[in-house]
């Protein structure tokens, strides 16, 4: 499970709730949250959902909607922000990880400004935006990634 997501969840939610993973892949983060008692749903291309288009879950609203390393793969990045807002309950939290401009490996990257601009005229309010480095030790990788993390809530 993404360690920063786990830290965020433990800090922001004293009790397990309901979460949606936009771009769940092999469901690693979903399983991690389920081990913490969360009820989780997840979608991505493997489940037949193209996140370049607005997505609304039949199980919405959620207490938490998160997306790890997906927004940089989308042609229509702002649509992901609208999908987050559409699926969050009022006061619900969101969590996004993507690659920051200093990352030399990722093909598409964001500056803090460019990522923040996606939230203009949406129902979401950014509470935190931070940059940091992580070591990628997956086979064949062995390099640092520069990460941009954005968290906040639905107004």
Language-model segments: which ranges?
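Adenosine-cofactor binding site in Rossmann-like domains, unifying the SAM/SAH pocket
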Residues: 40-57
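Conserved alpha-helix/loop element of class I SAM-dependent methyltransferases that forms part
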Residues: 1-17
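Short catalytic micro-motifs in class I SAM-dependent methyltransferases
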Residues: 69-73
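A conserved beta-strand element that flanks and buttresses the S-adenosyl-L-methionine
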Residues: 66
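Conserved beta-strand signature within the Rossmann-like core of class I S-adenosyl-L-methionine
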Residues: 92-99
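Short alpha-helix
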Residues: 108-123, 128
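Conserved class I S-adenosyl-L-methionine
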Residues: 16-25
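A short glycine-rich, Lys/Arg-flanked "PGG" loop and its adjoining helix->strand segment in the class I
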Residues: 79-90
């Amino acid at each position: 499970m993404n360690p920063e997501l786990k830290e965020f969840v433990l800090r922001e939610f004293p009790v397990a709730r309901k979460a949606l993973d936009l771009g769940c892949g092999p469901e690693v983060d979903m399983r991690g949250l389920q081990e913490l008692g969360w009820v989780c749903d997840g979608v991505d291309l493997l489940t037949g959902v193209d996140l370049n288009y607005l997505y609304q879950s039949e199980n919405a609203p959620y207490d938490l909607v998160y997306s790890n390393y997906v927004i940089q793969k989308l042609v229509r990045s702002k649509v992901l922000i609208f999908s987050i807002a559409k699926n969050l309950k009022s006061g619900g939290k969101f969590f996004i990880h993507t690659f920051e401009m200093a990352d030399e490996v990722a093909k598409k990257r964001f500056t803090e400004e460019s990522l923040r601009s996606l939230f203009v005229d949406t129902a979401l309010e950014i509470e935190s935006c931070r940059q940091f480095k992580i070591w990628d030790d997956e086979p064949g990788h062995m390099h640092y990634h520069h990460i941009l993390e954005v968290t906040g809530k639905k107004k």
